[in-house]
Amino acid sequence: MSLRNGHRLWVGLGIVAASTVFASNAQAQTIDWTAIENESVAMLQDYLRIDTTNPPGNETLGAEFFAKHFADNGIESQIVESAPGRGNIIARLRGDGSKQAVVLMHHMDVVPADARFWTADPFGGEIRDGELYGRGAIDTKGMGVANALALLTLKRSGIQLAGDVIFLGVADEEAGGKMGAGYVVKTHPEWFEGTSVVLNEGGYIASDADGKIVFYGVEAAQKIPFWVRLVAQGAPGHGSMPRPDSASNRLVRALGRVIAYETPLRVVREVQQFYADTAHLAPSELQPALADLRASLADPAFAKTFTSDIRQNALVRNTISLTALRGSNKTNVIPAEASAELDIRLLPDQDPVAFLEELKRVINDDTIQVETLLSFPAATSPLDHELFDVLREFAKRDAPDAVVTTPLLGGFTDCHYFREHDIPCYGFWPFALNEQSFGVVHGNDERIGVDVLKAGTRTMIELVAKLAGATLPNHAPSP
């Protein structure tokens, strides 16, 4: 049963499901992990076949997909649209209130996929050689399935929860999230009252080429996007008569100063901790230096070597990338206006306002206008949350040589919408991923290993149960 009310859609309890899946704690059923793992594969195949490319999004299709699964299992859900077709879905299992809520978030939109360059249909859900292909398999429809099955498994098992468990599927993350996480946090803050933690994309279980787990990475901080446009104006004219002070020339001179500017090195707590935790994985000659990265970067020779890797360089300084240039649309016309856009990423303890003043000093031309296109306030999550303790338990059980650590995310996710309201949000994909895995995110032939999906789904279910204060019953033996 569904009723539309403006941009809101409620999906009620399935009568048949309600009569069969509600169980008291005393009647808690065993868990057949093999069946759940197989269900994760089939569910992700179906989910990948729903095209939620952003733009335009059409995330309501994805929301309705989950709403049906929830209704079939006696779980009420609500879909709220920020605009027609731009759906966000929430579903909740109630606990007894002795612990705070756990929110399981993923984004339902995906980036475009050009089928000409794929070896499989980007929206076909094809399995080949043990891998499941489709746009969003990792980013983040696979996580959405693991989150949904956490909710469904807890419901079906009749387990008593201490805290609420909330499924949240949002729109628009790939375009900044204003119509997704930003919208629901602003318009429905009551959904998140009494929340202990939001689990989102970002961190991951890192594995080596042989599949051995080397660390559990929890993203507690990310760099701050600070996008600006530089605009120069001047007298237009014919290209045959150059103007030394033309808009284009002044802009190029300003950009030359920006490109030549080297921002100072700075090691934030998450980066210092990450390299200390993982130094033992590096070649032996580098281990002492990485164990105290902040001190080691004071050595110019080491700093030069370390920052020659563009990924490492981005972790220890504010970065500026020139990404767009606009001027005349004709070769023989000197434009009246020329502009450039800069993608600036600030370390999580930096102040965008202060950096803007520093940028203007570097530009050193008061005639150049600097416009802010995008800026988020700095926000991080604490490093002493229960989540870290639970993952240490898992590491001790499943990968005794692995550590739990805090990689800094160079990009940004929807976590900032929650951190800005003092709600702890952490990035943690429950999947064991390696360099090859990340190489296909936003690329051609995005895919996830079937075994990786199955194992990650179980990890998420076990993690959520722990955080919600629930004890999982013994699973049924595999056939």
Give the positions of each predicted feature.
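Bacterial N-terminal signal peptides that target proteins for export
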Residues: 1-13
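Active-site metal-coordination/substrate-binding segment of hydrolases
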Residues: 99-166, 451
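Boundary at the C-terminal end of the N-terminal hydrophobic targeting segment
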Residues: 23-28
